[in-house]
Amino acid sequence: MTSHQEAPSPLDFIRQDVQGMHAYAVQESRGMVKLDAMENPFTLSHELQALLGDRLGAVAINRYPGSKVDDLKGALKSYVAIPAGCELMLGNGSDELISLLAMACLTTKDKPKNTILAPLPGFVMYEMSAQLQGLDFIGVPLTTDFELDETAMLAAVATYKPAITYLAYPNNPTANLWDAGTIRVIIAACRAYGGMVVIDEAYQPFSSLTWLDEIRSAPVANSNVLLMRTLSKFGLAGVRLGYMLGNKTLIDQIDKVRPPYNVSIMNAEVGLFALHHKDVFANQAAIIKLERERLLAALTALPSVTPFKSDANMILVRFKDANAAFEELKSQGILVKNVSKMHPLLANCLRLTVGTPDENTLLLKALGSEPS
């Protein structure tokens, strides 16, 4: 009788934790009113499309990115009025910056494995980057009204001394701005042992506040703070551009693990184009903020629906039955994000992206808030 041994497989060399993971799933959205991914819903005018096409057609795509990326960094520094003593680095979206931070902070001389800490529910990439790079991740639940639990956060900071503490401002998916006083206390607690705090301002174009003002007014107190933003919500989600600024000494070290030419020359050209036409995107953001208030008012008037305050281009809404509401909207051609299983605090919650005025009217009609 011949015994059959299982042949060796290349999968044996793939990490077991990776094999146990699920790839990030993107919902099928063709033919739908797409209100699931916090994208800017506005397209460029035909005139701007033609101008951008001319610029991209003239790009030397046979050459590696070089001075064009430097031009973009310079333009972004001017755009944000970067504070003295700060530097800025670019990423292929903020996702790459999150990965680079984890890579740079994996181990130190005193700790074989460092820790990343973040409030939950929050952006999934904080935990995923820690897992993929081999760091420990500690999640600290928010309060029931989605505020930072100062006592729990400070206890976690004291216990684990995380290399990086992420604070989204405003948060995803809850869309709220956390109390600035609480954030200052957390930053100070991390600074006491040298820990970094990353303020993620992905939704800054729609927010009433920015932590950049704090960095300017109190540079020493924020010397351990890195500010991260993306141009996705600016209107360039398809381009993949993110940037991070902070103390030059810190940025210079993290920039060492960035792959060369991580931002393509085409992406850099589109970024420069967008900054040149920043007023167009600012006007789009203004419309989105007005529409957000219209949606909030209409949703508040609906029975059995609880919308939460938003400083982003999304609204978190609690329904009596989120799964039923999600399927009903989908049956009417409207795609939103069902976040009800992401965290116990999000039970029966859907996240609605603020769309164009017409898209938002369709959403409200589907929810029974607008006459057919």
Regions found by a protein language model. Give the residues of each.
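PLP-dependent aminotransferase class I/II
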Residues: S45, N222-A301, T306-F308
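Conserved core of the PLP fold type I
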Residues: A60-R191, V198, Y203-A221, Q284
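Short hydrophobic/aromatic beta-strand micro-patches
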Residues: L245, L316-R318, T353-G355
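Conserved PLP-binding catalytic core of the aspartate aminotransferase-like
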Residues: I288-K289, L299-G333
